Amino acid sequence: MAHRAVSRSALSRSIAVVLAAAVLGMPAVALADTAKEQELEARVAELEKLVKQLLAEKQAAPSPAPAPAPAPAAVAAAPAKPDAKPIQVATITPNAAPGTSFVFTGYAKVDGMWSDASDGELTESNAARDFYVPGGTPVGGLDEGSPDFDAHAKQTRIILGADTVLEGGDKLQTRFEFDFYGSSLGDQRVTNTYAPVLRHAYVQWRNWLVGQTWSNFQDPAVLVDSVDYIGATDGTVFVRQPQVRYTLGGFSLSVENPETTLTPYHGGTGGNQRITTDDSSLPDLTARYTWKGAWGHFSVAALARELKYQTTGTGAIDDSTWSAAGSLSGKFNLGKSDDIRYMLLAGNLGRYVGLNFVNDAVLDASGNLETIDGVAGYVAWRHVWSPKWRTNLYYAMQDYDNKSSLTGGLVNKSSESFSGNIWYTPLPKLDIGAEFRHAVRELENGDDGTLDRLQLTTKYSF
């Protein structure tokens, strides 16, 4: 570029000199003597020679390469104007939800487990292959001789919500929660695809809650820190259902969706049949009071409900009865690193405990309902070894007073399980766990079966 500029400048000066000489010399041609003419001719010849030389050099010089176009990245990296707003913080729909903050959280969890049943096989469609179901432990079958392995990510959870601050300062809260224990859209052969399942969907304002969530008869604060989906399943209330709940301080009262499960007279077909009636006219009623402190918490709860069955046609049945149950539960802190969690239940527990291990009532020969009562509970110890390591040991049980003359001998009588786990947290929000369980299921006639399971898991919370 510099050489090209010099050549152009020299050429311009040369041409200017030639023209100036020609112009200045023209008026004096007639008067000029021979010497001056010769001098001018010599200068012109010299200038012509110089011009030819410069033109030759210009033609011989290589053409410079065109300047490269600016890279897209450089353009993208150019600083924005001072008044420009970043796209990611600009409101797409201004004032669409004033005073509202949104919630998106949950976790991804993958489980792998070896299950060894003493009296038969857990079939592929059995939910007991995904998590511990006390009523799913085989009884009276033949031992396969080797454990079965299963892996899935069905417990993965998604939680959505919105919190809106109203004009008066009150907060309106909504929550939606899903996991993937729904009906299979695929299978283990190809896609391992499973449908999302609605766990919670409720609206909360001041002291009121309306929607689907944990039953008020349940104390979710004392659930075990388990690798399994539930943990102390034999001895805990585990029910989510639609309800209207009122809470004032430590006291809460609710009306909840009713349902009745019955055992037919002498157990019906197969000796352990279940009838789901959906005939109740009144909601289930619950009440709870909870005391809290630095020491932990203690809670007492009661449940009252109508059990009802109606049929039409020949041998029609129309009967109902009331039943009740009670619960004591709590968590006691033993210093900074340990706590004890427990629950004790008694009365007509039915569908509320052990994933409906026993039914609410049994039909007699005349079609009347007779309630089935029992006791259940668990105790768990949790110890934190360090910020990265923690351990849980727990025992759970349930036992029922069946009227064997009505139920027959093939209905569930009792179950219990012993479990221990260890959790490792190598990174924030990342948990790796292992848990072993030994479980026993017994029928009313005394037959029993056992289940041993080793479960491994990886869980990332977000």
Cite the ranges covered by each PLM segment.
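Gram-negative bacterial Sec-dependent N-terminal signal peptides
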Residues: 2-31
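N-terminal periplasmic/intermembrane-space "pro-region" immediately following the signal or transit peptide
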Residues: 31-123, 141
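Sequence/structural signature of outer-membrane beta-barrel proteins
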Residues: 115, 181-186, 215-219, 224-230, ...
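Detector for outer-membrane/organellar transmembrane beta-barrel domains
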Residues: 293-412, 416
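Outer membrane beta-barrel
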Residues: 89-130, 134-264, 279-297, 331-335, ...
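Outer-membrane beta-barrel "beta-signal"
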Residues: 424, 449-462
